[in-house]
A protein has these predicted regions:
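Non-catalytic, mostly N-terminal accessory regions of nucleic-acid modification and defense proteins
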Residues: 1-86, 143-155
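Short, solvent-exposed loop/helix junctions and linker helices
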Residues: 19, 161, 201-205
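Mobile active-site "lid"/loop adjacent to the S-adenosyl-L-methionine
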Residues: 174-206
């Protein structure tokens, strides 16, 4: 709830009105039949959550694409990345958004066949929280995913001696980054082999 503004006037003009609205909201959620963790029906609610995000992203137009990858695209990318594999050590998405690509890997391979879990990084706090909620709603145990809220290009959080066996991503296209404004970036082991940094107006090339 870190990015939830409980003092927003959209909830009501006074503190009492806002509290009444929040109580009503929580009671409404409490009364919903969301499925039981033990019988795995909670996964159906996760699918509904992704469907609603997809509808919202569609209505939001270009901005919606910042956090949501359509199911068809997620499935194609993940199948290409997992051809010939029945299990992998771990899956990574450096621009994970709401986590749709990570979850598609869980669905295609089976979550138990991703031995060390699911890893991702997302720069936007709200989208980062959406991703974590999405993981829980799809029955991914807390100790099987590691989502970080940082700028992947400037502050990668998932350095490891053992490389990721599968990397899937739909990075933000045509966004800006520091590029050669920060001369130390050329020493980054991810960029150094190229001998040049991606243009400041083409951060997507830095992801590649």
């Amino acid at each position: 709830f870190a990015d939830l503004d409980v003092n927003s006037n959209k909830l009501g003009a006074t503190v009492i009105k806002r509290n009444e609205k929040l109580v009503k909201l929580l009671r409404g959620i409490e009364s919903m039949k969301l499925g039981d963790y033990q019988d795995n029906t909670i996964d159906a609610f996760g699918d509904a959550y992704e469907y609603l995000m997809g509808m919202y992203a569609s209505n939001a137009g270009k901005s919606g694409g910042e956090y949501y990858t359509p199911q068809e695209v997620s499935e194609l990318l993940t199948k290409l990345a997992t051809v010939g594999k029945s299990e992998v050590n771990k899956v990574y998405d450096p621009a994970c958004g709401s986590g749709s690509l990570l979850l598609k890997a869980a669905k295609i391979l089976g979550k138990d066949n991703v031995r060390q879990g699911f890893f991702g990084q997302e720069i936007n706090l709200t989208t980062y929280n959406l991703c974590r909620i999405n993981m829980f709603l799809h029955d991914i145990d807390y100790d099987k995913f590691d989502i970080a809220c940082e700028d992947t290009l400037l502050s990668p959080q998932h350095w490891d001696d053992e490389p990721f066996e599968v990397i899937v991503s739909n990075p933000p296209y045509s966004t800006k980054w520091k590029g050669d404004d920060d001369i130390t970036l050329i020493n980054d082991p991810r960029f150094a082999p190229a001998g040049v940094l991606a243009p400041k107006s083409k951060a997507d090339l830095a992801f590649i």
